[in-house]
Amino acid sequence: MRKVITAAAGSCLLAGSLGALSIGSEARASDVVGHAYVNQNTTGVNTLSVFDRHADGALTPTPGSPFAIGGAGLGKGLGSQGAVQASGDYLLAVDAGSNEISVLRAGSDGVPHLVSAPVPSGGVTPVSVTISRSGVVYVANVGDGGSNYAGFRLGSDGSLRPIPGSTVAVPEGSGVGDVLFNEQGNRLVGTRDNTSLIDSFRVGEDGRLTAAKGSPFEAQSLGPIGAEFRPGSPDQLYVSNAHAGPGNGTVSAFRDTGNGTLKSIGSSPYADGQTAPCWVEISHDGRYLFAVNTASANLSSYTINPNGTLTLLGTTAFRNGAGAVDARLSPDGRFLSVTGGRGHLVTTFAVSGGDLTELPSSPVALPAGGSPTGLVVL
């Protein structure tokens, strides 16, 4: 089982497990331009909550939401980023309670349809999944007796098949918080939040992993969880460090030297002066980074300079004081949605450079029950 190092660390796990608030949402008149999906992580049969995404950024529940997805959730916080991901019309969601991955096809109306029976995750307690452009999939499993990175291939028909010889064991108790590919799909990293290490791998044409020289690397602070590669600069990696205690949150910046070896950028790690930055998101143009400070109930905004160093711009509070458990930008980059938190909510901000303004229609409520973890915005 995963250990909690500090109260701040626990906030990343517990933020999504509190009771739901009753938040009303007005019907929106603007056109539906897409959808948002949240892994509810419910026990018994797991579900996805789905929202219609409107042109003005507002979210309204899709009729029939939430939808059953086949496997079982864990019902408590996963402390991870990437519990649901998308590739084309397909959605992949972790079922942490049944050690499975569900593959669904999203309809034009946003309704997800299960492609087949959930697939075993290749380990115990899957918490994060990532998909490369070529259809290689890796899952981070964190449970005792099956803590690893396990590889699969996603077929054009939505089939998910294990890659022989792809599984890489991770020491039990490491608590992997995120697994992700770079844009090119030739590098993969995983964060070990309980031991403050970062795994880095080269990805072969066969989809199997080779550990980079020197891996795992020191995270530069306690509790690395969320991670993102910089769009347009696949050699630059940013990791949020959540466990250093009140007011001591940081974001680490690394450069891949070309073979998967990670080197520090500038004076990394970069302080945000907040508590438990558990998740990160980067603007599509690669110019701004947003860190979600779960225990401080706010977001920090940074400028990413051309050389990869960070400059802190400031913080933006959630209107209702809620924490958070994942964040994603809309495809056009105009809106940032943050899911989970105290009360089962999705909060949405308008984005202007590094400035964030919560929408008047925000937040919207998620169904009670489970522990919402993971967000996809399409």
Role assignments for model-derived ranges:
Residues 41-43, 53, 96-97, 106, ...:
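Short loop/turn segments immediately following the C-termini of beta-strands
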